[in-house]
């Protein structure tokens, strides 16, 4: 990403130093984990498996209070039972 958008690659600030995600002062990475709309049957890389509309709405006009209080974000949350191999949205 930094080769496309510029800036010097560096590990995430305040994040996991072992992460392979590189950012710079001009580049950031948006994690799509909270936007997965499907839990089984397709890979998370399949566009059908993500709620890009929700991501777009939250990214285009950020509510900075939501970054301070994550409870204000509309997240898709899955509760998964590894024992029964069932999941609920």
Curated annotation (Swiss-Prot):
How is activity regulated here? Light regulated via thioredoxin by reversible oxidation/reduction of sulfhydryl/disulfide groups.
* Stretches the record annotates as Disordered: 1-22
Q: What is its main location?
A: plastid
Q: Which domain of life is it from?
A: Eukaryota
Provide the E.C. number(s) assigned to this enzyme: 2.7.1.19
What is a single Pfam family found in this protein's UniProt entry? PRK
Q: Where in the cell is it found?
A: Plastid, Chloroplast
Q: What Gene Ontology terms describe where this protein resides (cellular component)?
A: chloroplast
- The enzyme's first-digit EC class, named in words, is transferase
InterPro entries found in the cross-reference section? PRK/URK
- Keywords for the protein's UniProt record, in alphabetical order: ATP-binding, Calvin cycle, Chloroplast, Disulfide bond, Kinase, Nucleotide-binding, Photosynthesis, Plastid, Transferase
Q: Which GO biological-process labels does this protein carry?
A: reductive pentose-phosphate cycle
Catalyzed chemical reaction(s): D-ribulose 5-phosphate + ATP = D-ribulose 1,5-bisphosphate + ADP + H(+)
Q: Which family does it belong to?
A: Belongs to the phosphoribulokinase family.
Q: What is this protein called?
A: Phosphoribulokinase, chloroplastic
Which organism is this entry from? Vitis sp.
């Amino acid at each position: 990403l930094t080769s496309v958008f510029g800036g010097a690659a560096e590990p995430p600030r305040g994040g996991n130093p072992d992460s392979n995600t590189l950012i710079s002062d001009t580049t950031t990475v948006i994690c799509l984990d909270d936007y997965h709309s499907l839990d089984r049957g397709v890979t998370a890389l399949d566009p059908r498996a993500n709620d890009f509309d929700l991501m777009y709405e939250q990214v285009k006009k950020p509510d900075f209070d939501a970054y301070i209080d994550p409870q204000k974000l509309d997240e898709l949350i899955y509760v998964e039972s590894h024992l029964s191999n069932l999941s609920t949205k």
